[in-house]
């Protein structure tokens, strides 16, 4: 794997490009809508105080320029851009190029399986490999935190090739890699698509045009029992789906297990007291007379159409009853159209 093309110029794209290039693990190219803002040299500042300097071989808005001849593609994009990017790169993909994503739970595999050749190698991280932040666009970024290891999935190649590719990812990203059973285990999660959407419905389902709130809500600090009850119901429906899918039993913990809780009351206490969540605010915007929900925020534009929707579609396909998820999804999609 000598040539990797990073697709997308966000924080993860900056860090992945700089980190891999600086460690000379591959020739790094970048596909971005703003090539004029990028330097051929990008610096990544690590938690250890290091400054890694990576040289990029090519930066372009033309997929033909940077995708042609690439051995690996890594999408660092929000869910709503994945379909468009797949269609953009498709004509220039080598038949043996591994096309992947930095985060699998925003619909990458569901779209790639529809758009790309059924033989095209696909891969993806279950969770993002880095916590990242842009310092100066196209020039520098902060790598704020690493995962201790990565769960990835690889599709449409032999078991031997999967293992070889996992070894390459471990070397390129500097952490051990565990191969998941299939793309479903990377794509289906009860984090953002369940956690966020259940809370948003509880906060805003009664809102209508003309209502003004006096202030912006805390998203987690005021997590209440009603929000926790809805989250538990949606999580139960999600696990009913997993029971009929070809996934490894227990590959994900339930919401109650993950947050070391036993009922809605204890879950509400737990979610409202996690230090890392303290101060995070609900997606709202200031208008004349107060505050209203911001339906253009990522909470809405990502987690409903590019998270919960795929869970619901699989439920329908497999005959799994999902009344709570159906209700929440229908409401959320009505706000994002």
Task: Tell where the protein language model's regions lie, with residue ranges.
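NAD(P)+-binding Rossmann beta1-loop-alpha1 motif at the extreme N-terminus of oxidoreductases
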Residues: 1-52, 58, 65-67
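NAD(P)-dependent Rossmann-like dehydrogenase/reductase catalytic/cofactor-binding core
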Residues: 207-215, 221, 225-337
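An anion/phosphate-binding loop that grips the pyrophosphate of nucleotide cofactors and donors
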Residues: 70
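Substrate/ligand-engaging "lid" and interaction regions
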Residues: 135-234
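Residues at the C-termini of beta-strands that transition into short coil/loop
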Residues: 32-34, 63, 103, 126, ...
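Short, aromatic/basic amphipathic alpha-helical patches
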Residues: 41-46, 111-116, 164-169
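Conserved beta-strand segments of alpha/beta enzyme cores
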Residues: 27, 57-58, 121, 178
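Rossmann-like NAD(P)(H) cofactor-binding subdomain of soluble oxidoreductases
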Residues: 74-75, 79-141
């Amino acid at each position: 794997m000598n040539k990797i093309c990073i697709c997308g110029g966000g924080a993860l794209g900056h860090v992945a490009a700089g980190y891999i290039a600086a460690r000379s693990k591959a020739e790094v190219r970048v596909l971005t809508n703003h090539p004029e803002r990028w330097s051929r040299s990008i610096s990544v500042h690590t938690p250890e105080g290091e400054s890694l300097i990576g040289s990029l071989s090519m930066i372009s808005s033309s997929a033909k320029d940077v995708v042609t001849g690439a051995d690996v593609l890594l999408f660092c994009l929000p869910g709503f851009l994945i379909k468009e990017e797949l269609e953009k790169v498709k004509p220039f993909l080598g038949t043996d190029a591994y096309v992947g994503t930095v985060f699998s739970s925003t619909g990458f595999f569901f779209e790639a399986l529809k758009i790309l050749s059924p033989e095209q190698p696909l891969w993806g991280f279950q969770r993002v490999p880095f916590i990242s932040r842009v310092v100066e666009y196209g020039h520098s970024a902060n790598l704020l935190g690493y995962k201790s290891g990565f769960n990835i999935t690889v599709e449409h190649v032999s078991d031997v090739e999967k293992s070889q590719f996992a070894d390459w990812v471990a070397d390129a990203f500097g952490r051990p890699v565990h191969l998941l059973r299939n793309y479903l285990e990377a794509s289906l999660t009860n984090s953002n698509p369940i956690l966020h959407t259940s809370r948003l419905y509880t906060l805003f389902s009664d809102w209508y045009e003309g209502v003004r709130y006096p202030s912006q809500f805390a998203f987690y600090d005021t997590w209440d029992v009603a929000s926790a009850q809805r989250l538990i119901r949606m999580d139960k429906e999600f696990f009913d789906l997993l029971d009929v899918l070809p996934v490894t039993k227990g590959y994900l913990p339930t919401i109650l297990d993950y947050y070391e809780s036993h009922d809605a009351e204890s879950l509400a206490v737990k979610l409202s007291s996690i230090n890392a969540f303290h101060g995070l605010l609900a997606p709202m915007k200031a208008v004349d007379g107060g505050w209203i929900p911001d339906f253009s925020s990522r909470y809405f534009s990502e987690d409903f159409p590019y998270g919960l929707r795929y869970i619901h579609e699989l439920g329908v396909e497999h005959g799994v009853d999902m009344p709570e998820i159906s209700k929440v999804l229908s409401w959320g999609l009505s706000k994002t159209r």
